[in-house]
Amino acid sequence: MAMTEYNPPKDPWIDVIYEDEHIIAANKPSGLLSVPGRPVEHYDSMWARLVDYCPDVKVVHRLDMSTSGLILFAKGKHMESALKKQFQYRLTHKIYYARVWGVMEQNEGEVNLPLCCDWPNRPKQKVCFEEGRDSLTRYQVVKREEKTTVVRLIPITGRSHQLRVHMQSLGHPIVGDDLYAPPEAVEFADRLQLHAAELCFYHPRSHWLRTLFVPCDFYPEAEEQILQHFDPERKLPDYKKLSQD
């Protein structure tokens, strides 16, 4: 399933929310790629914009093009390696907000369904108990609306399209999701209503715990609260004692 048209937002060109000599974090708008695509016309991306601003910037993780919110980059290869290792060992913690289709009855719960690529329908992913990788998402209802529900999503694993497929599996696809939602849910909003609001990680130089937060445009009531859901150590733990993702 190829991208038919790519017209990313240009204002603001870059929205840096935190920067020091080792890392840089930005608020990526919906509709902008995290990294360049293969066609030259898909070069414009969060990384490409930042590399003009900071030539040493390195990719640490990605957000789907349609997802907005907090994305973290490293400055230099050493910082890149240190941060990527935290994602690999599940030392980072994230909170997303989403508006989903339908009114959810259950206040909270979790989805534990293995995911893999749906190869004939790429880039779609699918639930697959034979070949899928373990995938776990926790969810909490924060606001019920007439036709939709705003939920807080806490991914424990970080699979491609995990939140989108897991919410679809509950019968509540994310509003504006042109891959997994029915037409009426897609047309209900002008963008995918999924936002990466909060990230908790260990600063790669100091090794002290750090949290960053980006307000959610479609749910401005969102507040920082990641440490209410996790109890990480204040200092970076020993990798040798941890299992990999």
Swiss-Prot record:
PROSITE patterns: PSI_RLU (PS01129). Its EC number is 5.4.99.28, 5.4.99.29. Belongs to the pseudouridine synthase RluA family. It is an enzyme of class 5 (isomerase). It catalyses: uridine(32) in tRNA = pseudouridine(32) in tRNA; uridine(746) in 23S rRNA = pseudouridine(746) in 23S rRNA. One of its GO terms (biological process) is tRNA processing. The gene is rluA. The keyword Membrane does not apply. The keyword tRNA processing applies. InterPro entries: PsdUridine_synth_cat_dom_sf, PsdUridine_synth_RluA-like_CS, PsdUridine_synth_RsuA/RluA, RluA_PseudoU_synthase. GO terms for molecular function: 23S rRNA pseudouridine(746) synthase activity; pseudouridine synthase activity; RNA binding; tRNA pseudouridine(32) synthase activity. Dual specificity enzyme that catalyzes the synthesis of pseudouridine from uracil-746 in 23S ribosomal RNA and from uracil-32 in the anticodon stem and loop of transfer RNAs. It comes from the Bacteria. Keywords: Isomerase, rRNA processing, tRNA processing. The active site is at residue 64. This is Dual-specificity RNA pseudouridine synthase RluA.
